[in-house]
Each structure stands twice: as C-alpha cells, then as structure tokens.
C-alpha cells in the first residue's frame, strides 16, 4: 500500500511540471484599476491604454476586459523564443464583441482589426513580414486566424460571421507535422487549411491586443480598435484538444455600470440612453409585450458619424430604462454608413 501511495505521489510530481511547461503563454484579461495586467508565465506586467479607467466584468474565466472600441488597447510583450522550433501549437482566446469594427467610408472591401496577435497587418490585410499569428475581426463580421508555418502564410476563414453578444471561444491548432491548421469556435471546427510541413514561424515580441499595429485615426479616435470583451489568451505546446471542452463561467455583460459616467457633467442624469457610445435621433417609441421600447441611432464603437447601429432601450415605467442588444447593425457591403433613421410599426 505504501509503495502504491509513493508511486502515485511520484507520478503526480512528474506530471504537474509537464502541464505547466506545456503552457507557453497565458494572459488573463483581468486588468487592475491602475491599468496593469500580466503575462503569467513570464510574470511581466503591462499597462493598457484607454481614454477612461479600465473596465472589467465577470468573464469566461475569471475577469474579462471590456474594450470601448475607440481608445482601449494593449501592446504587450511575449518571448518569441519560447515558440521557436515548435511544429505543433494551440492558440486559445475568448471574445464577445458588441459590434464589428469601423472602416473608412471612402474605401471598399472589408477592413480587419486585430483582436489579438503579433502579425504586422494593416486594415486591408497588407502584411509586413512573413511571420507571426493573429485572430482578426472584420467590419462586416468576418473573422479569421492567420499564422505562418515554415514562412508560408495560412489563413483559416470561417464562412459564418462572428457572433455578437455571446462568448466565442476561438481555438486554433497549428500542426506542422500533419500539415493542418484548424480553427474552432466553441468546440466546433469552423475552418481548416492544409499547411506545409515544418516549424511554426513565431513572429515578433510585440503582442497587439484590441488594435492592429497601424495607427488609423480620425482626430484622436482610433478606427481599427475592437469593441467588446476579451478574456484569457493562451498558447500551448502541442495539439491540445482538451482545451476545446472549456465552458464559459459567466454570460458576457457588454453594458456599463452607471457609475462609470457618474462624474461626467455633459451626460444627462435623468434620460433614457445607452450605457455608453455615441447616440442620436431617438425614434420608434412603441409599447409591446408589456414593455416600452425606444430605438435610436447608436455607434457602439465611439463618436463616429458612420457605421451607425439601431440601438434599443426598454422600460416598464418610462423612467427607468435598460439597454438591450442593438436591433440592426451594419454588416453587408451596402451598409457602409449604417442605420441612419427609421420608425417602428406593430402588427
């Protein structure tokens, strides 16, 4: 009995370090009030950027960081040497967008914003260099995972759009041994591509979180930033299919607490409005299923007169209002400017 017990303890002692070594990068998105966050394997700390204090909510795993769509982003540092020489890696990221990114109205096509990655991509996907990885989200809702194997680019591009207002657990397995790159969303394979055999090309040390590496702005406001929740980012050595089974601990909360803007003298203290973002032209008041509904122009990404959504607030009594998910959002090529005005009919 003692021998069995001793062997069990020894086995655990050997097994536990193997598990810890298999995790090469771990970045929880639990940001302190002073803007500090950590990469937990190296224990390096970084400061997030933003016009206001960072905002966190209960996340898929622990706390999640709420990015505002116009000013929030992070440039962290990872050690690319821990990825060097690897032929099999697993990348994992939790995302819950409120809206799709902005784009310039004088240009066609879909613009892409880096949710997280170290590939130097601009908004039109022009690439500087031939190395690195990135999870990207487009202005029409397309999403993709990009990586390099033996210096050759591989793109996994699902046909469906990335769901808003819900957790998307994005997992990419890059297998340079069996020549396959697969992207999963919430445990289901959504795209797969053949790659060349060889080592994964790790890219540089700068990790772009919530913004592409280029500086695209209108005045002081970024155009290529992400609006929504980000939670744990991890890179594992090897192909880790067990990661696909992970479930979110909490539903995503994309509204802001009223306390966030309590000191804003330009914000009405008694007025039905969204919890954040740009709003204008309230229309379409109606009573339906026991609640009052009001619709309005809303730009969840920030103070932009383009890519407008059709916002939605509801009330039981006409003085206390809560925000619902946007009713209509620009997603197709003809929706460049978004939803400008309208009305509501009940049938």
Show which residues each predicted segment covers.
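Bacterial Sec-dependent N-terminal signal peptides
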Residues: 1-23
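Localized edge beta-strand/strand-to-loop motifs within extracellular or lumenal beta-rich domains
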Residues: 166-182
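Short strand-turn-strand beta-turns centered on an Asx-Gly dipeptide
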Residues: 184-187
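Carbohydrate-active catalytic/glycan-binding domains of CAZyme proteins
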Residues: 232-234, 239-347
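Flexible glycan-contacting loops in extracellular carbohydrate-active proteins
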Residues: 60, 193-229
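Beta-strand-rich interaction surfaces with strong enrichment in secreted/lumenal proteins
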Residues: 78-81, 157-161, 196-197
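Short, aromatic/His-centered strand-loop micro-motif at the edge of beta-sheets
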Residues: 145-169
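Extracellular glycan-recognition modules
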Residues: 24-42, 46, 60-61, 69-146, ...
